[in-house]
Each structure stands twice: as structure tokens, then as C-alpha cells.
Curated annotation (Swiss-Prot):
Sequence similarity: Belongs to the pectinesterase family.
Catalyzed reactions: [(1->4)-alpha-D-galacturonosyl methyl ester](n) + n H2O = [(1->4)-alpha-D-galacturonosyl](n) + n methanol + n H(+)
InterPro entries assigned to the protein according to its UniProt record, in alphabetical order: Pectin_lyas_fold, Pectin_lyase_fold/virulence, Pectinesterase_Asp_AS, Pectinesterase_cat
Species name: Ralstonia nicotianae (strain ATCC BAA-1114 / GMI1000)
Involved pathway(s): Glycan metabolism; pectin degradation; 2-dehydro-3-deoxy-D-gluconate from pectin: step 1/5
Function statement: Involved in maceration and soft-rotting of plant tissue.
Biological processes per GO annotation: cell wall modification; pectin catabolic process
Annotated EC: 3.1.1.11
Designated name of the protein: Pectinesterase
């Protein structure tokens, strides 16, 4: 692959400082690692991703711009306060959320959370007013909402996320395993960790998914949050596959090891650290970061921009896929319908990719077995692209 060259051009002197403009020269695109042109890249920006929502086929455009984040904690005034040690109005996060829901109204409600470990399941129901949930400690790791649950956990006697209702299934299931689930619109979070502490292999099953956070309502903003798990850590998607919801993650941290950012929603990861953990899989298997199930009528799935992709646990170089398409509810290639079945969409741009990323083929076959293909394909062409990335895993 042709190497990328960056050149810096001095454009002005301001206050004694030289201001540089960086221009990225085009990288040769390959069939297995397609790169956007500068012109095409203008179609895949934060503004484009987050401009529209609603029913696919008749999306509503409101040009939502969340890039300012949720605001400074110093400017918040808590309507409800939570402290695990009993020094505040509520001891659990869910109790404060329930109080905000029961109070009704449409005004934004602020819930402060004192540093501590909150071992509980959290549901922000669809009926909730706009809620800002924030940790008082600026270190997100000091305020953790954590629970141990997973897809194969026996359902009998197990608690499941209350946003999901009851089920007759023998096991908890993927989404019911979520430590926290947000179904309301206009949810904001800051200075918090959402974690699923399930230890994979506790229960035998090929699907060891254990969700830390599921975002199912529109216009969610999460700033300085950590979302930690292994398989299926973070889900973004509406309750209906025909509906587009949006989430914006700013200066946040997402960790996992298999398909750990997944779903049919539209999400932007801006200035985030996306970290693969080799603690469970080690060097024995290639894995995947993104697993989008974007509907074919939605041009925007996941965007990572100005972000860092790295690893912990010393996985081998050139081993990790950036992603694969999650062909949700499609059992195999014979059941895949071009233009109707899901066709995941991801763009990674202006980001730093660590050496663990596969160089020649960073995008894997879909979950239904569709071979990765970017053009002239038997099945729907994959919608995975890169632009202007750097680092040992960028292929540049």
C-alpha cells in the first residue's frame, strides 16, 4: 500500500506562535482496506451522522449538534443526590431515577452520584424526563455502576435489566444482561463507569455476551464515561429496527474483546479511547471491535473520529479486526437478502490505530458468513471505510 505523507505548512504567526495547517495526501485504497477520498470524507462527518433520526424512509432532520458535550459539573444543580454510603437522599442510582420519573414533567432533571461502587441494574425508561446523570468525582473510574450478568446466566432466580420486561427464556439473554439501559431520549451522562463484571466461561455457551450499557433512546450524550466489558460491551440501537436513534460519546473509554460496539443505531465516538483487552482471548483468536447491524436504508452507523485504538494484555500485532457486519437475525448467506437484510456501516477517520490492527484485511466476514467485499459483490457491498488514520495499525 502506498504510504501516506503528512506535510506541515506554516500559515501564520499568532502571539509569537507558528500556526500549522496539516494536509493529508491521499492513500491508495485497496479492495480489502478501502480509503475515502477527501471529497467522499466530507459525507462522513459528525454533523452528517447526527443530522437525522426517526423512521427509515422518512427520517426527520434536526441537525442535532452535541459536540459541546453535557456541560461542566460545576454548573449543575442536583435535583436528586445518590451516595452508596447513605450520606445522600438515595443509596441507589435506580431509586433516584425512579423519583425523577415519578415527579413527571419535561424539564431536565439532574442526578448527582457520589464516588463509590453501585452494584445494581439501571433502567432509564422511555417515560423518563431528560436526565443528566453525573459523578461528582471527575475520574470516571471512581464512580462505577456495575453488575454481573450475561447471556448464558440461568434466568431462574436471576435479575435482568428492568427496561426489558419479563421473559420465558431459560437464560438471561444478551440485552437483558445490560448493567444499564437507556430508553428515554435526551439522556446525558458524565464522569461515570458502566461495567459488566461477568467472568466469561462461568456458564457454558458459545455466546458469552455481557452488556455494560445499552443506549436505545435518541440524542444521548455521554462525556468522560467508561464502558467496560468483554463481549458485546456497548449496544446502540432503538427498540425497532426501522427506527434510527443517535448517541454521541465524547472523550470516553470503551473496552471489550468481541463485537464490543454493536447495534443498529447511529453513534459517534469523538476523542475516545477504544481498547481491546486480551485478558480472556489472549493470542488464540482474531476478534472484532465493531459489529454494526445498520439497516440498509440508514446511511450512517458508527463513526470513530479523532480517537485512539489500543490494547491491554499484550495481544499480538496484526491480529485484531476493526469490525465485521452483524447480520442480525440472518441465519446464513442463503437467508441474506440484498437491500433488505442489515448491512453494517462504519467509518474510522483521523484516528490513531495501534499495532494490533490487521494491516491487510482489517474488516472480517459478516456474522452470517458473507465474505468481506467492498465492490462487485454477490451480497450487499460492505460499508466500511477509513480516512486519514495514523499509527502502526493504519497501514500507512
Amino acid at each position: 500500500m502506498q504510504s501516506k505523507t503528512l506535510y506541515l505548512k506554516a500559515t501564520a504567526l499568532l502571539g509569537g506562535c507558528t500556526v500549522f495547517a496539516a494536509t493529508a495526501l491521499a492513500v491508495t485504497s485497496t479492495a480489502t482496506r478501502p480509503q475515502l477520498s477527501s471529497a467522499d470524507a466530507r459525507t462522513y462527518t459528525i454533523a452528517k451522522y447526527l443530522a437525522s433520526f426517526g423512521t427509515i424512509g422518512s427520517l426527520t432532520t434536526d441537525n442535532w449538534d452535541p459536540t459541546g458535550g453535557v456541560g461542566a459539573v460545576s454548573g449543575f444543580r442536583a435535583n436528586y443526590a445518590v451516595a452508596a454510603d447513605g450520606t445522600a437522599q438515595y443509596k441507589t442510582v435506580q431509586a433516584a431515577i425512579d423519583a425523577a420519573v415519578n415527579a413527571g414533567g419535561v424539564a431536565r432533571r439532574y442526578i448527582s452520584v457520589k464516588a463509590g461502587i453501585y452494584n445494581e441494574l439501571v433502567c432509564v425508561p422511555e417515560s423518563a424526563p431528560p436526565i443528566t446523570l453525573y459523578g461528582l468525582d471527575a475520574n470516571a473510574g471512581n464512580t462505577q455502576i456495575v453488575y454481573n450478568n450475561a447471556n448464558p446466566t440461568p434466568a431462574s432466580g436471576a435479575k435482568t435489566n428492568p427496561c426489558m420486561g419479563t421473559s420465558s427464556n431459560a437464560t438471561v439473554g444478551t440485552l437483558r444482561s445490560a448493567t444499564a439501559m437507556v430508553r428515554a431520549s435526551d439522556f446525558h451522562a458524565r464522569n461515570l463507569t458502566f461495567k459488566n463484571s461477568y467472568v466469561e466461561g462461568t456458564y457454558a455457551d458459545n455466546n458469552q455476551s455481557a452488556v455494560a450499557l445499552a443506549v436505545r433512546g435518541d440524542k444521548a450524550i455521554l462525556e468522560n464515561v467508561s464502558v467496560i466489558g468483554n463481549q458485546d460491551t456497548l449496544f446502540v440501537g432503538a427498540t425497532s429496527t426501522t427506527t434510527v436513534i443517535r448517541a454521541y460519546f465524547k472523550n470516553s473509554f470503551i473496552q471489550g474483546d468481541t463485537d464490543f460496539i454493536f447495534g443498529a443505531g447511529t453513534a459517534v465516538f469523538h476523542g475516545c479511547t477504544i481498547q481491546y483487552t486480551a485478558a480472556r482471548l489472549g493470542a488464540k483468536a482474531a476478534s472484532y471491535i465493531f459489529a454494526p447491524s445498520t439497516a440498509p436504508g440508514n446511511p450512517y452507523g458508527f463513526l470513530a473520529i479523532n480517537s485512539t485504538f489500543n490494547a491491554t494484555g499484550n495481544p499480538p500485532n496484526n491480529s485484531l479486526h476493526l469490525g465485521r457486519a452483524w447480520d442480525q437475525s440472518v441465519s446464513g448467506t442463503s437467508a441474506y437478502i440484498n437491500g433488505s437484510s442489515p448491512n453494517g456501516q462504519v467509518v474510522i477517520r483521523d484516528s490513531s490505530l495501534g499495532a494490533l490492527i490487521r494491516l491487510a484485511d482489517p474488516w472480517g466476514p459478516s456474522t452470517a458468513g458473507r465474505p468481506y467485499c467492498s465492490a462487485n459483490c454477490a451480497y450487499s457491498a460492505n460499508r466500511f471505510f477509513e480516512y486519514n488514520n495514523t499509527g502502526a495499525g493504519s497501514g500507512n
